[in-house]
């Protein structure tokens, strides 16, 4: 029996399409014949419907997954205000506990062939006074996929984030170029620069390039990702 696969999705910033790309990967894994589930361990920003608190990002992931986890397993920490998690958690009297997230991830692996874990914000977003999302990625011990929001400044953001991932002893399994600014000048040149630098310095391939979509369509974006290459990388990372 093949061991389940998993990856941690981070981004160069907030609002650059991590959830969109994570949903696209879930569709891609499903097309690859895998049972795909999502974890959004920490979500900041909730709305109430039918007496239940929900999160839009988590809803998008559920819509894309072909294995839908119970809400308390998929998102053990759902914060109401859409702001920095450690600030909101303190105000709401919640402790964002990494061990709890690791336990949820362990359980999720028993229910799917692949589990996509989406972080919150960028790679180093504080969860407590002493721990951040980089510590979470280390605790999970997962290969990382970096979503680069292609806009002015993305080259430095991508290279800095890749360096931070390596400094934590984690594998950068690849990256996705997600075009968030349709009016950006020299977009092709920016993507080419990031591709060359990340390949040379980290051996990290470009897994796909997604044009600006309005509205965003994760199912269509899935066809733009090299899921076969990603699966191969994730399997190699297990050995």
Curated annotation (Swiss-Prot):
SUPFAM superfamilies: P-loop containing nucleoside triphosphate hydrolases. Pfam families: AAA_26. Mg(2+) binds at residues 19, 57, 118. Its cofactor is Mg(2+). GO terms for molecular function: ATP binding; dethiobiotin synthase activity; magnesium ion binding. Pathway: Cofactor biosynthesis; biotin biosynthesis; biotin from 7,8-diaminononanoate: step 1/2. GO terms for cellular component: cytosol. It comes from the Bacteria. Keywords: ATP-binding, Biotin biosynthesis, Cytoplasm, Ligase, Magnesium, Metal-binding, Nucleotide-binding. It is found in: Cytoplasm. It is an enzyme of class 6 (ligase). One of its GO terms (biological process) is biotin biosynthetic process. The active site is at 40. HAMAP family: BioD. Belongs to the dethiobiotin synthetase family. Homodimer. This is ATP-dependent dethiobiotin synthetase BioD.
